[in-house]
């Protein structure tokens, strides 16, 4: 309710979105950097015949702690070419250290389904995979020179992999990569994970967080891991993390009963927000907090409230961003900052 739009989609209409990324601090100048993709209207089941869909990956910089942003990088589909033509751009992730800047991006590319399943591939569609590129500084990022494959799949049960998210220190200081996987039928989605060094991705599990039993029975896509601040009631607890995820009851519209309870169901994509927690020493064992219903629904439009990402600042503040449906059914990126003083009051 307290969130404010920070980046608007290219049009204020149904099917136009911005988001699917994260925010980080630039250690060189202290500015706030943010990555995400512009998505225009279209239908993923028809390729590009009904619209351009994910058309641009962009990086923004804020000099006022997230109140306003200026675009500093923009890459279209041709810029993200990595072995085959890009049809659409989706979730991305940005990591910045003093020595290196890494970008992870998921794209749908012109690829053919494995032989036994080729009849299931819809005309004009491809296969999703995750690529990466890097530079020594943000202003030197150039995917055309450095982009390379990071994660692809040939397993029909997890054929499409997309929407990367990265976090550090889950176990033994390793960087955790989570991502979303879809089967060749596009009937569901899962959350996968692996450990990533910045160069190599260690063996992954494409389904470590099982789908739920009610509102998220069709889809669970983890988009953010947040270490719970060790203050108040959690000051002396073992390291504990929250996992924000997007869910859906079905990936196709269903006819609701005329006398049934009207509710958002997250059709088409993973659109409604859920939450789980887990002790870091027990990873990948997670526990749902949103077992019977989603926790995060937009009060406007379709109810879509997704792609949550939270930056834990050095001073203890939390800066959260997410993609939220508006009254016009567009989905701008919104943000809210929670001060460490407020966090201490909430957790004490």
Predicted regions, residues:
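Beta-rich carbohydrate-recognition and catalytic domains
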Residues: 1-87, 95-302, 313-348
